[in-house]
Amino acid sequence: MNITHIIRGDDHKINTFKQMQIYLAMKWELPSFAHIPLIHTVDGKKLSKRDKASTLDDYSKIGIISDALRNYLLRLGWSFKDKEIFNLDESIKYFNLEGIGKSPSKLDMSRILSMNEHYIKNIDEINLYNLLNEYCAGYKIEITADKAQKIKNSLSFLKNKAKTLEDIYRNSQYIISDKVNFNDDDLKLIDKTSKKIISEF
């Protein structure tokens, strides 16, 4: 069947013997079986579909970068020396089943956000804009051509106050939206000089 490895949660151990018998009966070559600890919630409960942000699309919707999520999941129950950040090539090079711990890992949203913040702050503005543009087109409103350059020029400081692409989108509304709402306190801070700067922008 050209299957070399079956890697799954340790709750499937009980199925393994029966499945091995099927392979042997069919005279197929047995794959390597690996049963790894389950991922739990921060409360120590088994992760389920009913939990908030349990699918990849859930994380995409809140602006989690795929590389950041991959890096976080890679380090969830696995380690390589004291290294924390892995690009895709390094992930493939260093990952091995022997490095996986025996205890269940906890899916911690605060750590996911921290990892995502690291990626946002360290990615170059061109790639970050492409990610933001894709995110906005998929989940928000598309960045129009006349706003694109202003967004690009602003990313160097927008990314320093962001943990997600959602944060960047929200903090760049003064560029993306044609209408900016000010409350009474905001208006008190806007003098003639401020109005001139805003209008020129």
Language-model regions: role of each:
Residues 1-25:
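Structured secondary-structure scaffolds
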